[in-house]
From Swiss-Prot:
Membership in a protein family: Belongs to the SRP19 family.
Protein name: Signal recognition particle 19 kDa protein
GO molecular function, one term: 7S RNA binding
GO cellular component: signal recognition particle
InterPro entries per record: Signal_recog_particle_SRP19, SRP19-like_sf, SRP19_arc-type
Keyword Ribonucleoprotein: yes
Function: Involved in targeting and insertion of nascent membrane proteins into the cytoplasmic membrane. Binds directly to 7S RNA and mediates binding of the 54 kDa subunit of the SRP.
Localization (cell): Cytoplasm
Gene source species: Methanocaldococcus jannaschii (strain ATCC 43067 / DSM 2661 / JAL-1 / JCM 10045 / NBRC 100440)
Subunit structure: Part of the signal recognition particle protein translocation system, which is composed of SRP and FtsY. Archaeal SRP consists of a 7S RNA molecule of 300 nucleotides and two protein subunits: SRP54 and SRP19.
Length: 87
């Protein structure tokens, strides 16, 4: 499963790729934050810093790959909760 920062970015609209509700979304999520959250969930993420999200192909944002067979939206919500919990 691939996770792009845009999926949980509060500044992005649904059209731009945000998948979680705005109240759960994170301002400027970093690959490092996503990686740490996934590790807290017991998963082993792989970071790809040079990848471009297809909807914003002009900017290099990177992505995270994780071997997860469950519901993607539920995982994204859990990532947001963990990242917000650190603040």
């Amino acid at each position: 499963m691939i996770i792009w920062p845009s999926y949980i970015d509060k500044k992005k609209s649904r059209r731009e790729g945000r998948k979680v509700p705005e109240e759960l979304a994170i301002e400027k999520p970093s690959l490092k934050d996503i990686e740490k959250a996934l590790k807290k969930l017991g998963l082993e993420p792989k970071i790809y810093r040079d990848k471009r999200y297809p909807r914003q192909h002009w900017e290099i944002c990177g992505c995270v790959e994780v071997d997860y067979k469950g519901n993607k939206l539920q995982l994204l919500k859990e990532i947001c909760k963990i990242i917000k919990g650190k603040n």
